[in-house]
A protein has these predicted regions:
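A short, conserved beta-strand element in the Rossmann-like catalytic core
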Residues: 16, 59, 107-108
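Short catalytic helix/loop segments, enriched in acidic residues and glycine
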Residues: 24-37
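Short glycine-enriched, charge-decorated loop/helix-capping segments at active-site entrances
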Residues: 21-27, 77-78
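Residue-level signal for inorganic ion chemistry
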Residues: 8, 34, 49, 88, ...
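Conserved alpha/beta core of the MobA/IspD/sugar-nucleotide pyrophosphorylase nucleotidyltransferase superfamily
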Residues: 2, 153-194
Length: 194
């Protein structure tokens, strides 16, 4: 059986959020955003969950303390999202056959969507799996270990895995969950979440 790691990128400052509270600790329906994002991941059946933290590391570590996650601190988080992606993939490389790359600000993902992505990855273990909703590419994506090295070589700045998808190609997986397109970048996104 293939081992699956979930890598949650939660290191950024959330500078577009424009609030007096750190974005990932802002309540979404009464629960801090990072925990709302984590809930379906915990229920989806991953072998390991890695949370990459950076900005507000102490507060993030404290809130994640009681959860079965491995915390990786990205001290280079100011250099862009790709540094968190790199830190998370490196952490997953030793213990997983594939990594599901999640954004910490996607609090509306459903457990069923994550399980469906894992099932698709079981059917196509050598392919990158990318969710699409109504023809639009979303997140999270699942990357097999055979692409880890290529992903690490291609990522820089805030480009994340887009270069890998362009270069290596991917399998389109249609889902009925609009949450794959929704992350919270601004206060306006929060107001419109309902």
């Amino acid at each position: 059986m293939l081992k699956s790691a979930a890598v949650i990128q939660a290191a950024g400052k959330g500078s577009r959020f424009h609030s007096n509270q750190y974005k990932l600790l802002t309540p979404v329906d009464g629960v801090p955003m990072i925990l709302r994002t984590l809930e379906p991941v915990l229920d989806a059946g991953f072998d390991e969950i890695i949370v990459v933290i950076g900005a507000h590391a102490d507060a993030m570590r404290q809130i994640l303390l009681d959860y079965p996650v491995r915390i990786i601190e990205n001290k280079n988080w100011k250099k862009g999202q790709s540094t968190s992606l790199t830190a998370g993939v490196r952490a997953a490389a030793n213990s997983s056959d594939r990594a599901c790359l999640l954004l910490g600000d996607q609090p509306f993902l459903k457990t069923e969507t994550l399980q469906a992505l894992l099932d698709e990855a079981d059917r196509f273990p050598e392919e990158i799996i990318v969710p699409f909703y109504e023809g639009k590419r979303g997140n999270p994506i699942i990357v097999p270990a055979c692409f880890y090295e290529q992903l690490l070589e291609l990522t820089k700045g805030d480009e994340g895995g887009k270069k890998l998808l362009k270069e290596a190609g991917y399998r389109v997986f249609s889902v009925e969950d609009s949450a794959v397109l929704r992350d919270i970048d601004t206060m306006e996104d929060m107001k419109n979440h309902g």
